[in-house]
């Protein structure tokens, strides 16, 4: 079964759902579809707020697709793949609507980047996070600016350097990544429903201005994240990285 992106609109709330059978890991085509869907709902007048979620209960997003990573054989293909996450982050940044992320399970790599790029992120208590890129021979170059903006430089460095260790949802809340955490998915969904309805009836012009203020200083990310994608694209070509990814896959 292939992955998919779907969306629906109800009472001013646009909900985008993504899915991939491999723990919601994201191949390049899904990343581009997700970025396009975020941009589309951002431009849809009847949408006042966006909720971003994934299917299942164990994993919010496992980051990049290892199958695609291993298949990368040239720099341009590598840059193209990693620019997918850049497109998603920039779409979230530029959408003139607040984006609420629903993190119902663990987040790895690019998944942490997506959670960090939302304007308000809810999570359950078992939604641990990990930036595992260094463990497979690359680095969190593309998602780094979004994660660092949310949790600060010290916490970002901790996640990046200690690439094999999970950090708890409580840690992520303490650092500012998660706005609130819940024991169950059902409790989280109630809170998301309450906030999204409040925002759907709030002043759209005020929210547009607030979003611009909140993201001030990121205007250069269109070019920055593509430069970062090229860095990851170059590293993924090395024998070290290919061997590390293969070893990681065999453990999984």
Predicted feature locations:
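Crotonase-fold acyl-CoA enzyme core
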Residues: 91-109, 114-203
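A general structural signal for well-ordered alpha-helical segments in protein cores
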Residues: 31, 66, 144, 153-157, ...
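Catalytic-core regions built around general acid/base machinery
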Residues: 37, 84-96
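Conserved CoA-thioester-binding segment of acyl-CoA-metabolizing enzymes
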Residues: 1-53, 90
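Intrinsically disordered, low-complexity segments enriched in small/flexible residues
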Residues: 227-231, 235, 247
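Amphipathic alpha-helical segments at domain termini/boundaries
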Residues: 1-17, 160, 164-199, 207-219, ...
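Glycine- (often His-adjacent) and acidic-residue-rich active-site loop
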Residues: 54-88
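Terminal peptide-recognition signature
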Residues: 16, 33-34, 52, 65, ...
């Amino acid at each position: 079964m292939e992955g998919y992106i779907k969306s629906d609109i109800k009472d001013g709330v646009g909900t985008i759902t993504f899915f991939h059978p491999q723990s919601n890991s994201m191949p390049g085509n899904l990343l581009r579809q997700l970025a396009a869907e975020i941009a589309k709902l951002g431009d849809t007048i009847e949408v006042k707020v966006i909720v971003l979620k994934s299917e299942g209960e164990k994993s919010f997003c496992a980051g990049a697709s290892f199958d695609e990573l291993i298949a990368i054989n040239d720099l341009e293909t590598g840059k193209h793949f990693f620019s997918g996450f850049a497109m998603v982050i920039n779409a979230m940044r530029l959408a003139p609507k607040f984006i609420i992320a629903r993190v119902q399970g663990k987040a790895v790599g690019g998944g942490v980047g997506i959670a960090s790029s939302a304007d308000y992120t809810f999570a359950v208590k078992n939604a641990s996070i990990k930036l595992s890129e260094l463990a497979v021979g690359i680095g969190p170059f593309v998602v780094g600016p979004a994660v660092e903006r949310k949790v600060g430089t010290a916490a970002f460095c901790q996640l990046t350097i200690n690439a094999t260790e999970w950090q708890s949802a409580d840690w992520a809340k303490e650092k500012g990544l998660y706005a609130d955490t819940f024991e169950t998915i059902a409790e989280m969904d109630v809170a998301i429903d309450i906030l999204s309805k409040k925002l759907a009836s709030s002043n759209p012009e005020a929210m547009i201005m607030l979003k611009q203020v909140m993201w001030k200083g990121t205007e250069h990310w269109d070019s920055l994240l593509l430069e970062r994608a090229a860095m990851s694209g170059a590293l993924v070509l090395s024998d070290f990285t290919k061997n590390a990814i293969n070893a990681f896959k065999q453990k999984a």
